[in-house]
Amino acid sequence: MKNLFACALITTSAFLPSCGQSHAATEIENVGSDTLLEVAGALAEKYGVMKPEVPISVAGGGSGVGVANLIANTCQIANCSRPLKQKEIDLAKKQGVDPVQHTVGYDGIAVFVHKDNPIQSLTMEQLNAIFGEGGEVESWKDLGMDMGDDAKNVIQLGSRQNNSGTYECFREKVLGKKGRFKQRCNNLNGSKDVVEFCASSKSAIGYSGLAYKTDDVRIVPITPAGQTDAISPTVDTVQKGTYPIARPLFMYTNGEPTGEVGAYIKWIKSAEGQSVLEAKGYVPLPQ
């Protein structure tokens, strides 16, 4: 990401990164979801072309990091790939913070494998058996495939850390609200890390935002529970709700945004802002 228009793109894995307690009156600090990190940087950069006097800094770390910063009042916008939990809302209110939710787009959580992995599709039940604690699918042979030897047949699991909105959405939709991931899952820091993990081994499988696809991985179509046809995550299937692992993407502010923050949120929801999301592989809001 080019630092051309006072837009800094910073990634961090700390729970509460320092966003700066004091900042210029027009500065916007935007922190949180790793899923939204790249597009948040692209939005900030494009907005900076129009309004270079409004510096926008963008940092990642996960949805939980964004929420923590919002509650601490150390950022103006928190990016989240999940809704705030009630306990987070309660804590925010105790701190004098009033979280206001803004839906800025939609995303399909894609299931990725190595580009040479021959798997054609998976059902939601099979995904549960692959990733879920107690699930009986441990080897690609359990799915009718052979990667060449016993070691390569062991499925390598790429997951996200538990402060990730992607982690929570996948768990709820695939494993169930009370479901747990297998302990042997590799808990990776970011969306890009999951895709790179899948690209590194023909035995690997993982889940991440659709926008992070590369030429080194394939997206596996998923068959919803009770259906027979596998569905790939696309703009159309996410908008229609037919792809089973999809979710809205949010930005949160402290109260209804006004001034430069309000203008920025409004622009993100406009056709021009939504075109940036779509170009990055996300599903735009209906206009």
Q: Which ranges hold each PLM region?
A:
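Short, low-complexity disordered leader/linker segments with a strong preference
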Residues: M1-E27
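Exported/periplasmic ABC-transporter solute-binding proteins
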Residues: C19-D107, F112-Q287
